[in-house]
Amino acid sequence: MLNCKVIALTNQKGGVGKTTTAVNLGVSLVQQGKKVLLIDADAQANLTMALGYNRPDDIPITLSTVMQNIIDDKTLDVSQGIIHHREGVDLLPSNIELSGFEVRLINAMSRERVLKTYVNEVKKNYDYVLIDCMPSLGMITINALAAADSVIIPTQPHYLSAKGLELLLRSVSMVKRQINPKLRIDGILMTMVMPRTNISKEITATVKSAYGQKIKVFDTEIPHSIRAVEATAEGKSIFAYDKSGKVAAAYEQFGKEVAEIGEKQRNQNRADRIR
């Protein structure tokens, strides 16, 4: 689509609900009538498995296949490898081959922009492309940030997780300065929140006071719930697993927040083109 928005979901700390957010944000946007592609940019293939594909190493065409074809200057077929999921999202899966590919990528020409070459073509078919990054700042994550319009940072109200935000923000700033000047941070999403515990309240307040002036902290908070873990284990979104629960309600609200930001940015882009 002309106004497709590409969002990287990233945090250098694992276990913060990043993949769960990618799945449920994607399905929430589909429920709003948007066309959505999810890209699994992690060799652990958590996103692929969270959508029910439990044997990722048996999948013949994955992100590493597509990126290798770009390096080899082969004809780009953007439909290659995309899986259509029953909940309405499309998926470009990943598997362990991405680890070996990341090593080979170091010697490639324009190595930071290989994924961007693919995304620039495939995004013509979508309203949103969501990239689930691995919890590190390796070459694949840098590719994701180079290809993205914006970043969403899921983090849980835990001291070490919030502390790690500073390092992540510096990394995003470096990519913006050196590779992708259009990159912006849409906001920080608080996940696995236990509202009745003091530590959750204190850390949430600390993050908002530390970053809320220059970076948006989303109004929506994703509550802690075993149902979200169960849904991932079942290979389903929270909407398919527990549609009337509090986590589904939170992700529905979050999807609307993200869509609202996207619409504002689209309107701004249209205005800039008219000038």
Residue ranges and their predicted role:
Residues 1-275:
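P-loop NTP-binding core
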